[in-house]
């Protein structure tokens, strides 16, 4: 098939060299080959299921199949991987639209119970990026392990309002950089653009909804109830060329600590 196990091993080895001990399989169910290699190499996994529930993000998304297939797909996922030692936790969603509706917590409860019935031993989380909404509709309170995508400055407020005693940075940073490109003056910027369509490797640039690595580290170090973070991302990937959404020829992300060729950026060494 299309899976190249040598490529998987190389990527995991690079992440281990950076110091990572866990990979989140965003935002879909991982290939069996990936999980097997993670088992062999000692890399832990947060196995994720869905990027969309019943409310659509896109016209041709999983919402078309959610009602009929969500329980079946989630059941198959957990049964398939629950005996793999690399699986550390489960994720039932990522930035779903149900975060902002009144019954969103009910859908989360439904999916979480499916997982819990099949595997009562592992934590279950959900990547939530709208803290105010999920605190209001109780989706955050419903989760076994609260996972917040971004706003680390919301952690303390959320902790005071939630029954759980732990918080996870389920998706963090989204710092922007291009390997070997350095922009002056060196200053923190949001959504900075340049004629060469690159981002500075000084790691001082981010999106208007994200932040720099040290912003997360401050909270991870100072708040005893935070248990770690999944940075976005380990590697650059095709698509989402923020902040150059429509400028040709940009077509890959700038988020990675490692570029598309597998070569470390400066941020790789910062994390290490």
Where are these predicted regions, by residue range?
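Extended substrate-binding grooves/exosites of carbohydrate-active enzymes
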Residues: 1-272
């Amino acid at each position: 098939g299309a899976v190249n196990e040598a490529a998987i091993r190389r990527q995991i080895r690079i992440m281990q060299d950076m110091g990572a001990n866990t990979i989140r399989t965003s935002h879909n169910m991982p290939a069996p080959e990936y999980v097997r290699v993670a088992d062999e190499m000692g890399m832990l996994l947060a196995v994720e299921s869905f990027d969309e529930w019943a409310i659509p993000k896109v016209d041709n998304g999983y919402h078309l199949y959610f009602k009929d297939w969500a329980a079946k797909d989630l059941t198959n996922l957990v049964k398939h991987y629950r005996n793999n030692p690399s699986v550390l936790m489960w994720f039932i969603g990522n930035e779903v639209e149900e975060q902002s509706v009144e019954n969103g917590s009910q859908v989360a409860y439904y999916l979480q119970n499916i997982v819990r019935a099949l595997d009562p031993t592992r934590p279950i989380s959900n990547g939530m990026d709208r803290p105010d909404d999920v605190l209001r509709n109780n989706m955050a309170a419903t989760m076994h392990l609260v996972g917040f995508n971004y706003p680390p400055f919301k952690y303390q407020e959320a902790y005071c309002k939630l029954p759980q005693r732990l918080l996870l940075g389920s998706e963090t940073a989204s710092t922007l950089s291009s390997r070997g490109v350095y922009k002056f003056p060196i200053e923190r910027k949001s959504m900075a653009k340049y004629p060469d369509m690159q981002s500075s490797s000084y790691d001082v640039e981010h999106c208007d909804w994200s932040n720099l690595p040290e912003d997360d580290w401050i909270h991870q170090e100072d708040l005893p109830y935070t248990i770690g973070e999944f940075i976005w991302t380990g590697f650059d990937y095709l698509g989402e060329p923020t902040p150059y959404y429509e400028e040709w020829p940009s077509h890959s992300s700038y988020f990675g600590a490692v570029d598309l060729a597998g070569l470390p950026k400066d941020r790789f060494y910062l994390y290490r």
